[in-house]
Amino acid sequence: MADLTPVQVLPADIGILNFANIGSDSLAECNRLLDKNHRDHHMFVRDTAGHNHIVHAVLAVLALGGSPQELRDRYDDGASMQRPLPPCDAELLEKLNDPEVFMATLSERAQYTTFLTFFERKMAERGWRSVLQEYLFARTPLADAMLGRLYEGAYHALIHLGYGIEFQSPAIIAEALGQAASHDDSGIAQLFRSAEEEAVFQYPTPRGTPLIELVHEVRANDQIRTAPRWSDYGNKMRDGIVGRACEPMSTLASQFQIFPNEADLERRTAEMIGVCAYMSGAAQRPGRKRKIDFFHMHALNSALFFTVLIRQQWIRLEDRVRMVERKARLDLAWYAVAGSAALDATAITDYSSPESDGLGWDELFAAVNKEHDDGHAAKFIRALKNGEMVSRRYEQGEWAEFFPMKGDMWLKLARMCQDTTKGMPSDLKWIPFTGFEQPWKRADLAEAGETNTAEKVRLY
């Protein structure tokens, strides 16, 4: 694969959100592992759902101060399930400059390598920022299609792009664009378009509508809350929210709007991060052990990268605003997809465990780096620390009602994450669809004396 660009994270680009000293030996091992993944592995581990998380896992652990051995361990955790890169279609590659051909090829997973090579060549010609401007932010039919797909698959391509921009890696950015182009379509772009059309007729108050208020409105709306059905399984977004409730969902979501200035963008980005964290910890079920929702976890893990994105001054303000508005609107849709669980702040504020009560952030970073995991837990704890940092200035005073996460709730939720994922097999670390009763029947979530079984759901 001569066209593949080497992955080379430089010492000056080790992430704007790193919370630990990163050694040169760890950085060298990170580059070796990421380059091997780039050259050897498909972005998708199977034909439906299933994403390659190696980049996410390795870079999250690196940013938290991981050793070379910990980086190798996280690579090995994911390597066994990967598929080889599909072949590059040389004939198609030469035709992708035609927007009609490009659009007609979208969603073809077998063409991931073709898309990857296409974007690498484009970046070699004129740089990754220029390529992102054309293929995400140009407001053309092709760019709008790609931007919508960036949010598909529980935010995975978005997370990948976030890592690429944070660590200034053209190869990882090309992977993200290739993933977005070849990903299946659940109709999220339709939801975005409808919400943006509705937003034109909204008249936001000077302070805007709190996102957490809109979360509660989702649960109170019978048409939205009942649209996803358990029998939809992994298609609750496509068949449930987009299929059965697109109009009421987009109308409600359109109420989240950001005024076109840097101050409001910064505040509402922090607000979005806090609401994602709050949903993750507060969506519990009385009488069952605590467990964090798989999809709320992804909402928070992707939210971290909007701290990165809103600082990219080479992206026009209106495009940065659009990206954050879409993220918050999609978070509302995913809350509905997950079953609109009742949210209880005391699940976070009252959290206590003898295993973790004494752990601070540094101890949690060190502990999660040692866990056999595909990177989800390390990303989650890192995202919580970032959320604590960017939200602190807004948690009290005039914006307090917009920020449900306050003070030590961030650290308590990080401890909850560590306690409920450590030593667990991957399929038991999280719980999907917390608003439905079925997943809570898992035997490992039963209190003493109870025995239940739950249907397994294939996750992303």
UniProtKB/Swiss-Prot annotation:
EC number: 1.-.-.-
Cystine residue pairs: none
GO MF annotations in UniProt: oxidoreductase activity
Coiled coil feature spans: none
UniProt KW keywords: Oxidoreductase
Functional description taken from the UniProt entry: Baeyer-Villiger oxidase; part of the gene cluster that mediates the biosynthesis of agnestins, dihydroxy-xanthone metabolites. The pathway begins with the assembly and cyclization of atrochrysone thioester by the non-reducing polyketide synthase Agnpks1. The atrochrysone carboxyl ACP thioesterase AgnL7 then breaks the thioester bond and releases the atrochrysone carboxylic acid as the first enzyme-free intermediate.
Family annotation (PANTHER family): BAEYER-VILLIGER OXIDASE MDPL (PTHR35870:SF7), PROTEIN, PUTATIVE (AFU_ORTHOLOGUE AFUA_5G03330)-RELATED (PTHR35870)
Name of the protein in its database record: Baeyer-Villiger oxidase AgnL3
Species for this entry: Paecilomyces divaricatus
